[in-house]
């Protein structure tokens, strides 16, 4: 176990690299690995959210140079999600319930990585503000409870519903994850959480991975084969968490 723990910064670097290439922060990947190592939710959630903040920030900056943020739609989306993520982070759940919810979210992330939701470009039609608020609210509460940023749910929804194109989806997801993760961390701070040095080391590694991955995703072709390998790992981790 100690040997595996020593490789965690490298593992988180690689996860951040892959996720940031599609505008995500990587929380579901970090949580899957920590879940396999039987870490407690009190460590898993804040660690994933903190890494999410820095990786999604870099991804947003990268993708903002190749796409434009639909401001009205995004404001409505985040108006629902940020308060929900804040209060969701303060909801106490048992270890068993947490792992089962997390397992389901990780399986969704795995399906997303396989390219299942990669639909062709279509005419973009932004939904009404109240729909965006309700979507944000629903994703935000799950985000706060589990410690994910919500991008693994939002991205496929944007593409399937035709609310954004591929690059724009990455841009929207990155900022959505960034703000939700900050909101979740603030909610956890209300319960007395303070990050330890180990989590800070992981965050630095993830940040570096995000720098590389977001550049690849915004300027080059995404590393498709590596994403499929990661998807297999996530499927295994998600099923394991659900069955525990």
Where are these regions (language model features)?
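Structural signal for alpha-helical transmembrane segments and their flanking helix-loop junctions
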Residues: 133-187
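Transmembrane alpha-helices of multi-pass small-molecule transport proteins
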Residues: 47-62
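Membrane-interface alpha-helices at helix entry/exit sites of multi-pass transporters
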Residues: 40-50, 72, 163-174
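Short hydrophobic/aromatic, small-residue-rich stretches within specific transmembrane helices
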Residues: 48-52, 173-177, 198-203
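Helix-loop boundary and gating motifs at the non-cytosolic
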Residues: 27-28, 151
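Juxtamembrane transmembrane-helix boundary motif
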Residues: 1-20, 29-37, 41, 58-142, ...
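Residue-level micro-sites within transmembrane alpha helices that shape
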Residues: 15, 51, 111, 146, ...
């Amino acid at each position: 176990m100690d040997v595996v723990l020593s490789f965690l910064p490298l593992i988180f670097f690689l996860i951040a690299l892959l996720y940031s290439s599609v505008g995500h922060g990587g929380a579901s990947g970090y949580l899957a690995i920590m879940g396999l190592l039987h870490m407690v939710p009190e460590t898993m959630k804040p660690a994933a959210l903190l890494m999410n903040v820095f990786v999604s920030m870099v991804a947003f900056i990268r993708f903002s140079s190749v796409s434009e943020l639909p401001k009205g739609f995004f404001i409505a989306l985040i108006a629902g999600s940020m308060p929900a993520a804040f209060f969701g982070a303060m909801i106490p759940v048992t270890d068993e319930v947490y792992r089962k919810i997390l397992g389901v979210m990780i399986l969704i992330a795995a399906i997303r990585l396989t390219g299942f939701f990669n639909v062709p470009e279509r005419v973009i039609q932004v939904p009404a503000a109240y729909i965006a608020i309700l979507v944000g609210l629903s994703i935000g509460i799950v985000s706060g409870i589990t410690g994910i940023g919500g991008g693994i749910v939002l991205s496929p929804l944007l593409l399937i519903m035709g609310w954004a194109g591929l690059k724009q989806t990455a841009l929207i997801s990155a900022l959505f994850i960034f703000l939700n993760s900050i909101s979740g961390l603030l909610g956890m701070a209300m319960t007395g959480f303070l990050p330890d040095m180990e989590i800070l080391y992981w965050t630095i590694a993830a940040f570096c991975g995000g720098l590389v991955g977001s550049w690849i995703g915004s300027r080059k072709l995404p590393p498709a084969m590596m994403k499929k390998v990661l998807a297999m790992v996530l499927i295994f981790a998600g099923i394991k968490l659900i069955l525990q």
